Amino acid sequence: MLSPKRVKFRKQQRGRMRGVATRGNTIAFGEFALQAQECGWITSRQIEASRRAMTRYVKRGGKIWIRIFPDKPVTMRPAETRMGSGKGNPEFWVAVIKPGRILFEMGGAEITEDIAKEAMRLAQYKLPIKTKFIGLDDQEKVAGSDKPASVPAITAES
């Protein structure tokens, strides 16, 4: 499973997930991708489960790129512990995901759109957030960018 080799600080605060992904929101390596539609945390176990599901379906047909990395430690306290006595120990690692972020990419000579779509569908079931399948031709930079760019102002005239 994925985790950082070494970190400057062992423990982090939880933080907030606001806005959309401004980086990592376009297809860079393959022809097909899985794009996040909402924000959330994806653990290293979920990333690994998705990767396995896709790899087993495409067998040796193509190449899969993982575009996210779990770099945030999540701490937990032991069960039935009294309040106080500091923050718990790091238990697992998560990747913070914002809408529009590309999670996985797939490409290769033997990968058709149908094969890629089915492999990504199997990976979607392993993830805790809504995602959508996109190709190079129909990619969008932002998850909600299918709305019109400028909405005319509605004024109330009496």
From Swiss-Prot:
InterPro entries for the chain: Ribosomal_uL16, Ribosomal_uL16_bact-type, Ribosomal_uL16_CS, Ribosomal_uL16_dom, Ribosomal_uL16_sf
One Pfam family named in its UniProt record: Ribosomal_L16
Keywords, sorted A to Z: Ribonucleoprotein, Ribosomal protein, RNA-binding, rRNA-binding, tRNA-binding
Transmembrane segment boundaries: none
GO CC annotations, alphabetized: ribonucleoprotein complex; ribosome
Record has Lipoprotein as a keyword: no
Molecular function (Gene Ontology), one example: structural constituent of ribosome
Gene Ontology BP annotations: translation
PROSITE patterns in the record: RIBOSOMAL_L16_1, RIBOSOMAL_L16_2
Subunit note: Part of the 50S ribosomal subunit.
NCBIfam families (UniProt xref): rplP_bact
Family: Belongs to the universal ribosomal protein uL16 family.
UniProt function note: Binds 23S rRNA and is also seen to make contacts with the A and possibly P site tRNAs.
Protein's name in the database: Large ribosomal subunit protein uL16
Organism listed in the record: Prochlorococcus marinus (strain MIT 9313)
Name of the gene encoding the protein in the UniProt record: rplP
